[in-house]
Amino acid sequence: MAGNSGNVTGKDFVGGVVGQNNYAINGVNASNTGVVNATDGGAGGLIAHNTGVLNNITMINAGLVTGTGTDGDSGTGGLIGYNEGDITNSVLENTVGFEINDETFDGVVTGVSNVGGVIGINTGKIENTSLMNKADITVNVDENENAENIGGLIGKNTGTVTGGRDASDSYYKYQIYNNGVITVNGNGSNIGGLIGNNEINGSLSKGYNTGAIYASGSKNVGGIVGNNEALSARYLTLLWLILLILIKTPQSPAVLTSVAWLAQIAAH
């Protein structure tokens, strides 16, 4: 598996392996265990900005990814900052406990807006692909500022995301889930266990969240989606609600925990 273990710092569209990809990539395995830092924009643990077709690839991030972007084109993700391309038959994982040469690495994502455990902003078509986030996501908001679109998997989504079964249809081969903890310190909006902001035409199916969300100063906080604009134009169907507990305490007035949903968010 090819990979990056060095620290990478730049202004915007900073990637641990690739900054800008406009070409098709097929049959590649890659990882990042280094620190990827964008000082005035978005970052991706592996790819900062992708417009190409990705097929049959495995990408794993176990490094620290930090972005500072707040505009609509700046996305920060554990694997990809901003994805506009199609992704098929692949695995994208932001993980913890990743071992290389007896050394253990943990993926962490920090940012301001359009932050996702796997992808910051997605406008592409993703199918028969695993999107898995096991790492923590932390957003620290300065006073008088507002963070928006924070998701366990995707910060802002206008594309389609679909898992899938194996050829025998006996089990879900491609997993879509988040079990990392999302923490937003300060004012925020559109905070979701899977997607922060699912815009019109955005969809996700066959996914679930088990991660806790701590966002006491935020609005539009959901176990699956923080803000679903596709609902107003189309509909939202929950296939299976396993458990949802909303805890309100004086210390943490808006904390979602112990959430495990299998849901379909669709725009048809």
How would you name each of these model-derived features?
Residues M1-H268:
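Surface-exposed loop/turn motifs in large extracellular/passenger domains
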